[in-house]
């Protein structure tokens, strides 16, 4: 009887195309993680959208504070608050860039995994075994 990591052999002694234990494990793991990765991706996308909106609101508020400061007859110093808002905006932009880079890496990784999975399936379906595989 064939082990979990070896290919099956027909009665004539020729290898029978079929997934190895390692391939089955990899595919199962991929299917197990796919919903979590997709959920994470959608959450990152939502956070990025909200950060863009937050950045726009900070810009609007800073502009409005500057306008109020210029229009005031009483000397009210709003500059420190404007600086704090601009500093917060800078941090929001920084976090957004980090999220964007992480999301792009996740997208590339997901693409690579899907490509490798398709390649392995094609090899298994055609009966071609990679060098060093137990079915050779």
Swiss-Prot record:
Subunit structure, as described in the record: Component of the biogenesis of lysosome-related organelles complex 1 (BLOC-1) composed of BLOC1S1, BLOC1S2, BLOC1S3, BLOC1S4, BLOC1S5, BLOC1S6, DTNBP1/BLOC1S7 and SNAPIN/BLOC1S8. Octamer composed of one copy each BLOC1S1, BLOC1S2, BLOC1S3, BLOC1S4, BLOC1S5, BLOC1S6, DTNBP1/BLOC1S7 and SNAPIN/BLOC1S8. The BLOC-1 complex associates with the AP-3 protein complex and membrane protein cargos. Component of the BLOC-one-related complex (BORC) which is composed of BLOC1S1, BLOC1S2, BORCS5, BORCS6, BORCS7, BORCS8, KXD1 and SNAPIN. Associates with the SNARE complex.
Phosphoserine modification, residue list: 10, 50, 126, 133
Location of N-acetylalanine modifications: 2
Modified residues annotated as Phosphotyrosine in this record: 129
Superkingdom of source: Eukaryota
Organism: Homo sapiens
Subcellular location: Membrane; Cytoplasm, Cytosol; Cytoplasm, Perinuclear region; Golgi apparatus membrane
Coiled-coil residue windows: 37-126
Post-translation changes: Phosphorylated by CSNK1D/CK1. Phosphorylated by PKD, phosphorylation controls SNAPIN protein stability.
Cellular component, GO annotation: acrosomal vesicle; axon cytoplasm; BLOC-1 complex; BORC complex; cytoplasmic side of lysosomal membrane; cytosol; Golgi membrane; manchette
Expression sites by tissue: Expressed in male germ cells of adult testis (at protein level).
Keyword field: Acetylation, Coiled coil, Cytoplasm, Cytoplasmic vesicle, Exocytosis, Golgi apparatus, Host-virus interaction, Lysosome, Membrane, Phosphoprotein, Synapse
Renumbered residue ranges of the record's region Interaction with TOR1A: 83-136
UniProt modified residues of type Phosphothreonine: 14
Functional note: Component of the BLOC-1 complex, a complex that is required for normal biogenesis of lysosome-related organelles (LRO), such as platelet dense granules and melanosomes. In concert with the AP-3 complex, the BLOC-1 complex is required to target membrane protein cargos into vesicles assembled at cell bodies for delivery into neurites and nerve terminals. The BLOC-1 complex, in association with SNARE proteins, is also proposed to be involved in neurite extension. Plays a role in intracellular vesicle trafficking and synaptic vesicle recycling.
The keyword Acetylation is annotated on this UniProt entry: yes
GO molecular function ontology, one term from the record: SNARE binding
A single GO BP: lysosomal lumen acidification
Protein name: SNARE-associated protein Snapin
PANTHER family: SNARE-ASSOCIATED PROTEIN SNAPIN
Family recorded in the similarity comment: Belongs to the SNAPIN family.
Topology relative to the membrane: Peripheral membrane protein
Keyword Glycosyltransferase: no
Chain's gene name: SNAPIN
